[in-house]
């Protein structure tokens, strides 16, 4: 059985590799992306920095809206006179059956859009999985 210090060293290496991998992925995004921005993803535009006093477009002290004035009740209308009964209509002639319409041709399926290329410096599967693989190898080697 290996000494306890080797187990602790393996756990330390595992943790260090994970934190380093996350740090490298965050650093790859670039210094201009640090901090919160409002506006979300746009068409290549950067969002504006969120300040401490920013209320996300809402007024912190809204003015109360004036209450609407009650409308006067309308006067009741006189009841209309009953209409005389209409005469029964003659039975309509049966319509000839329409010819069935030919089925429309199915539209060709649009070509699937190609996957967009990742932004330069964005975290990829390789940049995230590499620290996990190194840390796992260190754990296996220690035990």
Curated annotation (Swiss-Prot):
Stretch forming the signal peptide: 1-27
InterPro entries per record: SDr-like, Trypano_PARP
Prosequence residues removed at maturation: 122-143
Organism: Trypanosoma brucei brucei
Principal location listed in the UniProt entry: membrane
Any Pfam family matching the protein: Trypan_PARP
Statement: the UniProt record of this protein carries the keyword Ubl conjugation: no
Stretches the record annotates as Disordered: 28-125
Biased composition (Acidic residues): 60-118
A cellular-component GO term for this protein: side of membrane
Ranges of compositional bias, category Basic and acidic residues: 31-52
Glycan attachment positions: 56
Keywords annotated in UniProt: Cell membrane, Glycoprotein, GPI-anchor, Lipoprotein, Membrane, Repeat, Signal
Known role: Major surface antigen of procyclic forms.
Record keyword Coiled coil present: no
Name of this chain's protein: Procyclic form-specific polypeptide B1-alpha
Stretches for region 31 X 2 approximate tandem repeats of E-P: 59-120
Lipid group attachment sites (GPI-anchor amidated glycine): 121
């Amino acid at each position: 059985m290996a000494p306890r210090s080797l187990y602790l060293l393996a756990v330390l290496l595992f943790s260090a590799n994970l934190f380093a991998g996350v740090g490298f992925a965050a650093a790859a995004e670039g210094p201009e992306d640090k901090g919160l921005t409002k506006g979300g993803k746009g068409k290549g535009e950067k969002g504006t920095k969120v300040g401490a006093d920013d209320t996300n477009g809402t007024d912190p002290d809204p003015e109360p809206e004036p209450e609407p004035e009650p409308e006067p009740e309308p006067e009741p209308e006189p009841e209309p006179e009953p209409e005389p009964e209409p005469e029964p209509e003659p039975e309509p002639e049966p319509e000839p059956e329409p010819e069935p319409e030919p089925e429309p041709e199915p539209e060709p399926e649009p070509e699937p859009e190609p996957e967009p290329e990742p932004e330069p410096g964005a975290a990829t599967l390789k940049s995230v999985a590499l620290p996990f693989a190194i840390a796992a190898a260190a754990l296996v080697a220690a035990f």
